[in-house]
Amino acid sequence: MGSEMCIRDSAIITIVARMFVVFCCLPVHELAHGWAAYKQGDDTAKKLGRLSFNPFSHLDPIGTIMIFLFGIGYAKPVPINPLKFKNYRKGVALTALAGPLSNLVMSFIFAFIGSGLNRLAGANTAMQLLVLFFGFAANINIALAVFNLLPIPPLDGSRVLAVILPDRAYEKYFRYERYIMIALMVLLFTGVLDTPLALLNNLFHKFIYFLPNLVFGN
C-alpha cells in the first residue's frame, strides 16, 4: 500500500511540476528571449506584448503537449527583427541563448531549494513531496535547456547556427524547417534521441547540482 501511494504521489507531483513549468517557466524562457532582443536594440517583442509573464501569450499547443508527454517541449517563439540589432550576428546568438540560459538559472534555483528542503524534510511527508516537486522542476528545466539547444528548427540552437553558418547555407537549412521538425517528432516518439538526450541531461545535472550538493551535502 505504501509503495502504491509513493508511486501515485510521484505521478501527481510529476504532473504538477510539468504544469508549473508550462505556466511559469516557459513564459520566463520566452520573456528572456524578448528581453535579450530588446537589449540588443529590437523592440518587436515589446510592441507585440510578448515581454510578459502571461503564459497564454507564449504557449504553443504542440510544444505544451510535448512537455506533458516527454517532459521537454517549447513555447511560441518570440518574434524578433534581427535588422534592428546593433550587431546582427551577436544579437541573434545572444537572443537565442537567453531562453535556455534562463532554464538553467531556474533549474539551479529549484535544485538549491530542493536540496535545502531535503536536509530538513526527515520523515515529514509534505516536505518530502516539496523536495520531489523542486527536483522534478529542476530536472524539467535542465531537459528544456538541453532540448532547446539542439540545432534543429524551430529550437533555439538552430538560431545560433546563424552565427556559424554562411548566410546561403543557413537559408537553405531553414527552407526545410517543417520537415526537420516532423523528423524530430518521429525521433522523439521512437525513442531514438533518448540516449543522447539522457547523456546531455546528466552532464548538465551534475553541473547544476554541484554547488547545492556541496553546500547541503546531499
Give, region by region, the residue ranges found by the protein language model.
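Hydrophobic transmembrane alpha-helices and their immediate loop junctions
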Residues: 3, 8-218
